[in-house]
Amino acid sequence: MNRTLKATAAIMLMMVFAVGCGKQPMKPQKQAPEGAVDGLFSINENKQVYFSQGNLQYQPSSNTWQFAWNQYDCIDRNDYIVIDENYDEWIDAFAWGTSGNNHGAVCYQPWSNSENDADYFAYGDSVANLYDHTGQADWGYNRIRNGGNQTGQWRTLTKDEWEYIFDKRTTTSGARFAHAVVNNAFGIILFPDDWDPTVYSFVEVNKKKIFSPFITNVISETDWNALHYQYGLVLLPIYQRGCAYWSSSYNDKNDEYGLNCAFEMSTLPGFIFVGTNEYRHNKCYVRLVQDAD
């Protein structure tokens, strides 16, 4: 097939996708900040946020933070590798409050490996959240090279905000989230507040437990790129064995976990648990947000 025919075929394929999905005329751009997905998500009755374009990543040897270039990107973790300040690969799972800023915790470096949960008290305070005091315990305080590269632009969602996104948001379509397999990666799709359900057909919407996660909402890379670039869908990728995303809130419940834990959003294929506990020393993903004006 010559170049002209290839180009014609590509254009026809794009037209088929647009018609097949019931695609509407391109909606006005929201002018999302650098490094953000162009969709708005309510975190309470009066406030919206943009999600970052991917999970947070860090390279110890260069002290560099960045967002994953694709929403479905996860770094295959090897628990037997010793990570220190000289490690020259990227990591994307962190103990709680390990922003790299010396905010008062014993362990504040992103590569910290202590299994003593008290070493990760934000600001050295057992009852402090990441956003308390100077805010420097939050990973979003850092310069992120593909996210505006300024301090204090991003932040981690609180426990209550995670719960609002999954359970309480009022959206145009009524859809808030769905399990999916995107480009062979398992994940949770979050629909923006103004999602139009005629654009693409999703099943098992707003269900935290499903029975066929491996064949539910299977989306190719091509279709996903068209959806998330224009319509602002967010994907929270997960490992097949499960993973968790940190909140900025410490565990303020008087339960058996006590102050050793912070709150998280955890998931495995087919299951979602919001507002659960995770020991502070455990390594979890971080997905940052930026407040909308």
What are these regions (language model features)?
Residues 9-18:
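Bacterial N-terminal signal peptides
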Residues 19, 69, 174-175:
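Generic alpha-helical propensity signal that fires on short helical segments
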Residues 31, 39, 46, 53-60, ...:
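C-terminal, surface-exposed recognition/capping segments
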Residues 18-39, 237:
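Bacterial Sec-dependent N-terminal signal peptides
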Residues 1-9:
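Bacterial N-terminal signal peptides that target proteins for export
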